[in-house]
Amino acid sequence: MKVVGLVTEYNPFHNGHLYHLNKAMELTGADISVAVMSGDFVQRGEPAVLDKYTRTSMALNSGVNLVVELPVNYAVSSAESFAAGALKVLDYIKADSIAFGSESGNIERLSKLAHILCDNEDTLYKEISKYTANGISYAAARQKVVEKLTDKDTAAMLTSSNNILAVEYLKAIIKNNYAIKPYTIKRQGDSYNDTDIRSEYASATALRGNLKADNISKYIPVKAGLILSSNTNYIYPDDITEALFTRLLGILFASSYDKNVFIENVMRYPDVNKEIAGRLYKSAMDMITRTVPQGAESKDNGAFSFGSLCEHIKTKEVPLSRIKRALVRITLGLDKKHMEKYANEPYIRVLGFDKKGQEYLSYIRKTVEVPLITKIADYKEMLLDDIHAANIYNMIVAGKYGVKEFGDFVRGPVRV
């Protein structure tokens, strides 16, 4: 069986994802499609708009054969770690190829850039650090350094979201010598960050902002649309405000209100530097006095919110996306030591499958080198971070909609 891997979030599944799936099967000649999908929290540093089981069902009913979960530590990490984690999973599940979207659509150019970045990793780190130390943003610094190593047009590829991830997938393949052949599919329709619907291939960003619109069904495959319409418990970034608030106050109390101890504690989380930690301390102290941090008022009612706090504490050197991921990791309690966990205890967590996907699982079960998990009760220690993230997500849903969400211990893989 030939297997193509797809690294996804399906947040939610839409026409562009169906195009990607069909094109991937056509280009690679694969028999089986395996989606490595983020769980209940996604790479942009937000909760997913729908829970992972609903999104798995949307994918399987649209033609994906097997969905496995990208461990949460990778799912809410930088593009480099996100891609590295996804490729680890695809390697363990014995994928022959990976097909990913890109604005470039040119695998040769993307591969050449990935090789250059791998060959000059130490130089890149040192030169980028020099620029950021002088107040230049990370993205702008990287652009300048890569342009010196290549040329303006090549460096410009790293200004587009999908190209950035594409290069990171290729870097992971190069560094680890994975026997996974890469293919790229040129992105169709609206751009990744478009907030308005402009074509039949609307961005997931635009769709999340228009989920209650009457005409949204035309941008989502029929079966996926029926699943979407039957589940309206949508979760948005600001819905995690209370969970973040509780976590920050917990760190503050554990620090006995000592600023230096608080800063030391939050700097254990990826992407939190001393300046960001200091701003978080002030915000946490303001919460104690029920004072909304100046500049952190939400647009709706002036109250503190996740989104407004992210905007408040971001800096020129540290972009908003990085701040959001840092705060989500704090909310979930995923400090730096948690990043080592999957490297030491790898696994494949199955979220769902159709008949072909089930046949493939049976085919590889005896030869796969890591636990292939369909029943989590036997692996609860190994899956602790993923289970904890799901529990927090389910508590948010229950608090917002007054409904009981069944956790990971109750819900088995989705079967289609």
Predicted feature descriptions by range:
Residues 1-55:
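N-terminal catalytic cores of NTP/NDP-binding nucleotidyl/phosphoryl-transfer enzymes
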Residues 6-7, 36-37, 68-70, 183-185:
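Short beta-strands and strand-loop turn motifs
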Residues 8, 42-43, 59, 73-74, ...:
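Short, contiguous strand/loop micro-motifs
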Residues 28-30, 64, 95:
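Short, high-confidence coil segments that cap the C-terminus of an alpha-helix
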Residues 56-71:
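A glycine-rich helix N-cap at a beta->alpha junction
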Residues 70-416:
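Active-site cores that bind ATP or allylic diphosphates and position pyrophosphate for catalysis
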